[in-house]
Amino acid sequence: MKSNFSKFKDFIKYKKVAVVGIGVSNRPLIKFLVKLGAKVTAFDKKHREKLGSISLELEEIGVDLVLGENYLDKLDGYDVIFKTPSMRIDRPEFVKAKEAGAYITSEMEEFIKYCPAKVFGITGSDGKTTTTTLVYEMLKKEGYRTWVGGNIGTPLFANIEEMKEDHMVVLELSSFQLMTMDVSPEISLITNLSPNHLDVHKDFEEYVWAKKNIFKYQSSDNLLVLNKDDDLTNGMENEALGDVLKFSLVEKVYNGACLSNNKLTIQGKEICDSKDIKLKGRHNIANLLAAFCMVNKYVSIDSMKYVATNFSGVEHRCEFIREVNEVKYYNDSIASSPSRTLAGLNSFEKPVILIAGGYDKKIPFEPLAEGGYDKIKILILMGDTKNKIKSAFEKVISHKKCEMEIVIVNSMEEAVKVADNMAEKGDIITLSPACASFDMYPNFEIRGNEFKNIVNSL
């Protein structure tokens, strides 16, 4: 049952509130809390010089700042603490604050709790952003006032008072955001599950447990959408509290969506032919099927078909850049896990020259090597994980008695130069790192943009 936002306004007024993190996504939250009458202190590891003008901007509206290396040591004495999603709730500083009586929460928890609109929540290891965007586009095409947020778009909590009951909200939710959730969206989807973010989660079990929070608190009239082709998600049907729809690329599904004789269908109704879809790869057909399940109750077949046959993809996701000397370049910088890179490799008709490697999330690369060795012509590796990925592939190559050239490089520029020199006419070169970007870049967008800039300068 949704709570009225006036309850939150009454609760937060005059409260001593700490907001941990002064990043771009938290700034609207800080300003909104001030507007609601809270006494806000913003915490950040960065010093004033690094933060730039935002520190002055916040101080001018009455926000106190706690900055620098030991910033979390000063979390005592607050009524409410808004934590940044990637920070674990069991950090000693949060445990101590909670024991002292602080209410620890996050922007997303409070948003879902009080949002008057219908909320569609999407999580999973792969396909989240594309599916979130597809659901958003389908609802928008049908004529709904639709908002998009979570991991993409803009932070929505500051806009909550503009939202109405007949609006629609589509959220991409990470395991970090879901970890402390005690509220679930009315319509929820888990795209698939494979090991990811094990640098933050204790183990894969905890990662899966966090993902389940997207449906754990649903009611009997809510909907959960599950991937029938993924054993882990398929088995979650038994834990669902409301209705369940499933989607599949390989089996006929009557209570859900499937690919049947190259036709995309929802509950037996044909939407379109797979050859008419602009999105590249079977994984994107799965994303479309998942989106159909989510919007089935609210969107016409015509709106679904329009989006399916006109939507050409999201930047940094198997994005075609250009063709140089009959060699095609693709940017798949979003691929920050082995399973996502495998999905990208499967979307090409022939083995590719793959540029991979990056920040180490403590996840295994053996599944990528075993599933991808025959889809890669040349493997170019960089970043913290280069030797770890090389080792995984060398084992598989030795076992399969096959050949693959593996080249280690030290920068994106060198990777593109090597790929360009080694490529032959008709080859495909793709950046699909199988890793996060944080060893070399602040995020996957900046990594993808650098790759595109280098390719465009060839």
Swiss-Prot record:
Q: Belongs to which family?
A: Belongs to the MurCDEF family.
The EC category is ligase
Q: Where does ATP bind?
A: 124-130
- UniProt lineage: Bacteria, Bacillati, Bacillota, Clostridia, Eubacteriales
| Main localization category | cytoplasm
Q: What species is given as this protein's source?
A: Clostridium botulinum (strain Loch Maree / Type A3)
- Signal peptide (from-to): none
Q: Which reaction does it catalyse?
A: UDP-N-acetyl-alpha-D-muramoyl-L-alanine + D-glutamate + ATP = UDP-N-acetyl-alpha-D-muramoyl-L-alanyl-D-glutamate + ADP + phosphate + H(+)
> What keyword terms does UniProt attach to this protein?
ATP-binding, Cell cycle, Cell division, Cell shape, Cell wall biogenesis/degradation, Cytoplasm, Ligase, Nucleotide-binding, Peptidoglycan synthesis
Recorded GO molecular functions are: ATP binding; UDP-N-acetylmuramoylalanine-D-glutamate ligase activity
What is this protein's record name?
UDP-N-acetylmuramoylalanine--D-glutamate ligase
